[in-house]
Amino acid sequence: MSKALLEDLKWRGLIAQSTDAKELETALSKPISLYVGFDPTAPSLHLGNLVVLLVLRRFQLAGHRPIPLVGGATGLVGDPSGKNEERTLNDEKVVTDWVAKIKKQLEKVIDFSDKKTGAIMANNLDWTKPVSALEFLRDIGTVSYTHLTLPTNREV
């Protein structure tokens, strides 16, 4: 089944290359869980989401469990598409509403039933909201180095 799934995805142009095709085939020989992230920066998914949704559905039909990960925390930060202007911050109630609307759209493509392959909706706000800024800085700040992310060329 795993080889058939991979061949189907390749035939459809959905796999261009793979680091270790044999290892991937071996991993898919038993049921796995896989996720795709969706940012709720609008009340609806867009056409660009369709391809990954169809891939999730194909994996589900092949016996695997999809986990659509909705970035509720990311949605609160706002849409980064306007690179030359400050992001518009979204209200938590608005983002919560968008998450619910997106789930309804996801339910039209993937199965959220209690079956072994039933999709599980995850929201990164569930595990990021309880973390305070101080906790985050203590846990992450001690192992990340800002100077590595700054440009070496200081010209603006």
Identify the meaning behind each predicted range.
Residues M1-P40:
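Non-catalytic terminal extensions that flank enzyme cores
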Residues L9, H46, M121:
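Divalent metal-coordination and catalytic microenvironments
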Residues L24-P80:
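N-terminal catalytic cores of NTP/NDP-binding nucleotidyl/phosphoryl-transfer enzymes
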Residues K83-T88, R138-G141:
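Short, hinge-like loop/turn segments at secondary-structure boundaries
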Residues N90-S113:
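A glycine-rich helix N-cap at a beta->alpha junction
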Residues E107-A122, L148:
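Short secondary-structure capping/junction motifs at helix and strand boundaries
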Residues L125-P130:
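Short, internal active-site loops enriched in acidic
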Residues T146-T152:
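Conserved small/polar residues in nucleotide/adenosyl-binding loops
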